């Protein structure tokens, strides 16, 4: 028997990329149905047959007015809800109807975003080696990752990872996972897809559960996709952001701050009032741990991509860190135009940032700054922190077709 001619260490070295994982393309998609926030309280209380709850409707109007959301996109239409009245109750068995929607529509919406990312990337789909699919809704087997592989015509040997029920922090999670995959598999090109549809969480109002109504005022549907790879071939690939470091942590004394429970009535959502306080109280520690190795202490000198869980979170983070209003411009734009799309939000914000940076004539994809931070906040209370490095903008770059 012949002896091996290489060592394990040599094999491992050959498997690893040389440079950092890099975002090479971004695509986004929404359902066609657009809901304007100013009209939503009347619509919501009418479709749920709750117009007799006049005081509660006034509270909901105030929630919508304070949300800083202008419009959202939702797959659920009035016609579908009229055909499924149990989905309009606060607590009525409706999981089957919800599942029938999301197991079909989540991969379909993800496909629309993935098509845009792949088109911008400009390389053959056969070069995609890994697929990471994330959604808060629609657990099924085989999963949305399998369905998307078939829909896109990816290679049967693509390495798939399906992430269900993570929640709003998961836009950071998928980038952290994609970074590890790209940097530890030389030549890997990772397709990351976050697809979120609120059909699992929609429900009627309850006077005893105002936290559920907060979700009804904030959540919207959307999907985003990115291509991630290390050592890009800059003759045919256009780097957008480098993923420099990534970490996850559970905030102290935050158990029960954000919960979701999948039941016969769908996915119930529970929120404590002090979520903005918990996040702002701990945000400086996350920033210090991420940026101390870089010698960065001025957080107005970096670009910001923060999950827009709601305006109060953004307001309190700005106040705690002393941020100038411009730093959250891309984040607040996505909140205004799409609402809270859970895991997909931060990828929408990256897309908005690189496009706006190019349109404004900035020197880099990160609003002219070299370094940036991406935060995901969600159940746990869990925080994902990703350190980003922008790239110089060349003529025509950083804007998708």
From Swiss-Prot:
Q: What class of enzyme is it?
A: transferase
- Protein EC: 2.3.1.74
Pathway given in the UniProt record? Secondary metabolite biosynthesis; flavonoid biosynthesis
Kindly give the SUPFAM superfamilies that the UniProt entry links to this protein: Thiolase-like
Q: Does the keyword Transferase apply?
A: yes
Q: Which Gene3D superfamilies match?
A: 3.40.47.10
Keywords (A to Z) from UniProt = Acyltransferase, Flavonoid biosynthesis, Transferase
Q: Which residues are catalytic? A: 168
Gene Ontology terms for molecular function: naringenin-chalcone synthase activity
GO biological process terms, semicolon-separated: flavonoid biosynthetic process
The record lists the catalysed reaction(s) as: (E)-4-coumaroyl-CoA + 3 malonyl-CoA + 3 H(+) = 2',4,4',6'-tetrahydroxychalcone + 3 CO2 + 4 CoA
Q: Which InterPro entries match?
A: Chalcone/stilbene_synt_C (IPR012328), Chalcone/stilbene_synt_N (IPR001099), Chalcone/stilbene_synthase_AS (IPR018088), Polyketide_synthase_type-III (IPR011141), Thiolase-like (IPR016039)
Q: Which domain of life is it from?
A: Eukaryota
Q: What does the record give as the function of this protein?
A: The primary product of this enzyme is 4,2',4',6'-tetrahydroxychalcone (also termed naringenin-chalcone or chalcone) which can under specific conditions spontaneously isomerize into naringenin.
Q: Which family does it belong to?
A: Belongs to the thiolase-like superfamily. Chalcone/stilbene synthases family.
Concerning PANTHER family, the annotation shows: CHALCONE SYNTHASE, HYDROXYMETHYLGLUTARYL-COA SYNTHASE
- Name by which UniProt lists this protein: Chalcone synthase 5
